[in-house]
Amino acid sequence: MTAARGRTRIVTVARWPAALALVSWRYLWRTTPLHRREEPGSVADLPDSLDEGDRLHPARQGLGAGVGPLLHRCYAVRIAGSSMSPAELIEIVAANLNRASPEMAVFAKTRGAEGVLAVGDEFVVRMPGPWDGPVQVVRRDPTSFCFATLHGHLEAGQIEFRAAADGDGLRFEIESWARAGDRLSDLLYNRLRLAKEIQLNMWTHVCVRAAALAGGRPVGGVTVRTRSLDWPPSRDTLS
């Protein structure tokens, strides 16, 4: 780790009290039920491509560049009462990510046109906790888009946002495959679990906001499944 990057990490840690206070406040006033499940992972939890986006950016920070276990997380909400199609919902979310994100997180676009989301666009996610970091859009289709982390992010991996029809409603999901970006991040995320809770609060908020942006309401709360896989995967895991 360079001296400059080390100083950045120290500043990030210093900002944690405010982030944790906000997370605690949200938990106290949460009205949408949250259903959490944690379980051991398997080779089935690996993303379809471990190298998603490598050809787009030489500074891609893939899973192999990370530290600690792979965490495969999926946040999902069923939306009732919306007249939108899955593509219409994703278009609204993608056009302005800050409409769906909590106020503690700001998506600052550093490459690409405003108001649209295309492959190759880049953002820096600004947060008062351990989430400041650059990302790039590596996949975009009518009902989904995917970010990959770039060098300097506190995680190494990728995250996908998608919507689909679910009976007479919609289903909005956020799925991530990530490892800590360095040893300090591994400590704060996997050992102390502080960053993990901030992340959970952020993405469950996005799920609830997606329901509102769709003109509907969450049904049954938000489900969060976390599967942890040691890295590199063992032969037993791969068998």
Name each region found by the language model.
Residues 131-133, 138-139, 149, 180-182, ...:
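Beta-strand-enriched cores of mature, soluble protein domains
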Residues 60-64, 134-135, 174, 178:
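Short, flexible segments with low predicted structural confidence
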Residues 184-235:
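A conserved amphipathic terminal alpha-helix motif
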Residues 152-197:
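Beta-strand/loop substructures that line and gate deep hydrophobic ligand-binding cavities in soluble
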Residues 2-126, 233-239:
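Hydrophobic ligand-binding cavity/cleft-lining segments
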Residues 126-167, 238:
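Hydrophobic-ligand binding "helix-grip"
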